[in-house]
Amino acid sequence: MFVVAHGFTGAVDRPHVRRVARALTRYGAVVTFSFRGHGASGGRSTVGDREVLDLAAAVRWARELGHARVGTVGFSMGGSVALRHAALYEEATDAVVSVSAPARWYYRGTAPMRRLHWLVTRPEGRVVSRYGFRTRIHHRDWDPVPLSPVEAVPKIAPTPLLIVHGDADGYFPVDHPRMLAAAAADQGELWLEPGMGHAEHAASDELLGRIGEWVVGRAG
């Protein structure tokens, strides 16, 4: 069973999320959902903080359906959520894949991330996000600041971990996946994908197939 965690401004009905789900169905059952504040889901996005509760609920539901083995596959924001979920919820998942995730919070080193921070932190940005991207963002800052992805990674072992990142990612350069891989040491794998951009939009069917095979091979 795969539980797919989409990126920021994604939703279960977005074409790129549906494509990911279709690709993974060749390897097992798939659960998709929209994080809080995204698409038709209620509430407001906390941009990766309380979203860990949403993923936990989806994984729990997958278990209740009778699936003994569950792997999470997260993209960008969803990738950071998958890392934190695996660190905080012991034995909740049997394999974790994080695609295009940041290593640390508050990164503004690229133009796309500076635009994203404008969407999140400015009132006018949140209006654009609501009506332009169907994503409703909570106005409050994080308090406390959640465990960062790079801090979460060492807590995931012995659960199998795969970190996937494109070397042409315009949001988070390759120092992010390398930091995550260093934190995982010999407990994780790193795939640096030549020419790949960011998150679901950039994940080819061939890559999704390899991810599906990896999860099946590790989670059983």
Regions found by a protein language model. Name each.
Residues 46-65:
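Alpha/beta-hydrolase active-site loop
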Residues 74-78, 82:
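Gly/Ala-rich beta-loop-alpha elbow adjacent to hydrolase catalytic centers
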